[in-house]
Design a protein with these regions (language model features):
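Helix-enriched interaction subdomains in cytosolic or periplasmic regions
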Residues: 1-16, 66
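Low-complexity, highly charged intrinsically disordered N-terminal segments
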Residues: 39, 44, 50-61, 68-85, ...
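Conserved mixed alpha/beta core segments that line enzyme active sites in large multi-domain catalysts
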Residues: 116, 123-125, 132-136, 244-258, ...
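Glycine-rich beta-alpha loop elements in corrinoid/cobalamin-binding modules
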Residues: 76-223
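N-terminal [4Fe-4S]-dependent radical SAM core
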Residues: 10-40, 47-48, 205, 211-262
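Canonical Radical SAM [4Fe-4S] cluster-binding loop centered on the CxxxCxxC motif
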Residues: 53, 255-279
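Conserved, mostly hydrophobic/aromatic
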Residues: 63, 107, 161, 269, ...
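Residue-level signal for short, function-critical loop segments
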Residues: 43-47, 113, 267
Length: 279
């Protein structure tokens, strides 16, 4: 039986403790000693909002179908628990195993809207992960950004090790295989980032130089090494009939913001307006 990261005293003192205990219907449990990669999936908002998001459910199910990967979840804590974690020096933890987020191989953060940017910094700070990618060492998780806001990644570039540009079902398998191969060859963190940069749709900010005009607009942008492509192409799912989809989605114990069945009948928009991420 797993041990909860929070004591009964703390759980009884905070609002909606079910946000933090995990153990929901269809939550995936694995033996950490029998997987090669531990991935912590983060929706940087409160549990009720994150559990309403279908994209997280799709990737969670897809990753956990691999025997060599265990994907867990973490969400932004409410201010009451945020204060307790800081006061008691309890590191932010995943729901499934209640393990510290900083102990994972990857921390994947979906960036759905700009208003969650400060929550991303909160997640990193509470987890004890250095805020800036350049400050992270060999034992820190690789921090990945995904979701619609990665179409303009530069405002957050210094906080992420890499960005996945496009739809998540396409090249994560190649990224995991590259990580395993880099580990097998005793490669460094930098070696892995260079391997990752060769994968279509993966943008590694540290492998590029960006300069700006006085008004903040981009003046120059170019790769710093041969592994980084001149242009990162977004990844698209071309066959939705063959795309993974959760057969047993995680069912929360408390009421989610969208307290109903979620079905995807269409993705994106055919109009292609230049100001819109969906198009």
């Amino acid at each position: 039986m797993r041990k909860l990261a929070l004591s009964d005293e703390i759980l009884l003192s905070i609002e909606k403790p079910a946000r933090y205990i995990g153990g929901e219907v269809n939550a995936v449990m694995k033996d950490p000693d029998k997987v090669d990669i531990r991935f912590c999936m983060c929706f940087p908002d409160v549990y009720e909002i994150g559990m309403s998001h279908l994209g997280i459910q799709i990737l969670y199910d897809m990753f956990n179908r691999r025997e060599d990967v265990w994907c867990e979840r973490v969400y932004s804590p409410w201010p009451d628990l945020d204060a307790i974690l800081r006061r008691e020096k309890i590191p932010l933890f995943s729901l499934e195993s209640q393990s510290p987020v900083r102990d994972f191989d990857f921390l994947g953060i979906t960036i759905q809207y700009e208003m969650c940017y400060t929550n991303i910094l909160q997640i990193l700070d509470l987890a004890g992960i250095p805020l800036h990618g350049a400050e992270r060492g060999e034992t820190d998780p690789v921090v990945i950004g995904g979701g619609p806001c990665t179409y303009n990644p530069e405002p957050l570039a210094e906080f992420f090790d890499l960005f996945y540009i496009g739809e998540g079902e396409v090249v994560y398998g190649a990224l995991f295989d590259a990580y395993k191969e880099n580990r097998r060859q005793s490669g460094s963190r930098e070696d892995f980032l260079k391997r990752a940069a060769r994968i279509p749709g993966i943008y590694v900010p540290s492998l590029y130089h960006a300069s700006y005009h006085e008004d903040g607009t981009l003046a120059d942008f170019h790769p710093l090494c041969p592994e980084a492509p001149e242009r990162v192409e977004k990844q698209l799912v071309m066959d939705f009939d063959g795309a993974p989809y959760p057969e047993a989605p995680v069912v929360p114990y408390l009421k989610a913001t969208q307290d109903r069945v979620v079905l995807e009948i269409q993705r994106g928009c055919i109009r292609g307006c230049r100001f819109c991420q969906a198009g």
